[in-house]
């Protein structure tokens, strides 16, 4: 979502609360519960899952491995659910030409640096950069080059849904708004 006026451009970023993350967190949680249930069934010697005859699975080595996969899956699933709950990666980019300030805010993981807040002067922006990598795993990332600070990504590095036309359009609009050149690498 964007909000734009003559002097201010605010772009809100979604973060980790995406449908795909919810989907994979649910699938991983349910799958790991299934593995753990099969491992527990083989240990107890009782059929806890009516669909699968898990009494035929020996506890050592198959039941141990299934239990290990179930526990590992629960840990990974809990990590995904925590990133969704904390909404890691969400935030905003605010470009204010009137004040001459650019603010970049992102939510991180809990701790001392949970709130990531970067502030720059518009006159320190050297250029807007576009990185394009084609092939099996295409990447199109928009960067802002800051004098003395290096480059800062403005789009998510895992965002593969930008077509070349969309990323060019976004870079051109932002460069025009900030009155800086565009570089492609």
UniProtKB/Swiss-Prot annotation:
Alphabetized InterPro entries for the sequence? PSI_Ycf4_assembly
Task: For this entry, list what GO says about its biological process.
Answer: photosynthesis
CC terms in the record's Gene Ontology section: chloroplast thylakoid membrane; photosystem I
Topology of this chain in the membrane: Multi-pass membrane protein
- From the record, give the transmembrane residue ranges: 21-43, 63-85
Q: Which family does it belong to?
A: Belongs to the Ycf4 family.
Protein name per Swiss-Prot or TrEMBL: Photosystem I assembly protein Ycf4
């Amino acid at each position: 979502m964007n909000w734009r006026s003559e002097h201010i451009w605010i772009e809100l970023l979604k973060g980790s609360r995406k449908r795909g993350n919810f989907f994979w967190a649910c699938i991983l949680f349910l799958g790991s519960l299934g593995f753990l249930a099969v491992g527990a069934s083989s240990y107890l010697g009782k059929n806890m899952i009516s669909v699968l005859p898990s009494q035929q699975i020996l506890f050592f080595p198959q039941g141990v491995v299934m239990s290990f996969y179930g526990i590992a899956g629960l840990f990974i699933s809990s990590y995904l659910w925590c990133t969704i709950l904390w909404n890691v990666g969400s935030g905003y980019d605010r470009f204010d030409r009137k004040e001459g300030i650019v603010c970049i805010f992102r939510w991180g993981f809990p701790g001392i640096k949970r709130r990531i807040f970067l502030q720059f002067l518009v006159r320190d922006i050297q250029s807007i950069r576009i990185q394009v990598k084609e092939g099996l795993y295409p990447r199109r990332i928009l960067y802002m080059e800051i004098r003395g600070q290096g480059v800062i990504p403005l789009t998510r590095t895992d965002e593969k849904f930008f077509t070349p036309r969309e990323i060019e359009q976004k870079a051109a609009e932002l460069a025009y708004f900030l009155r800086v050149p565009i570089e492609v690498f």
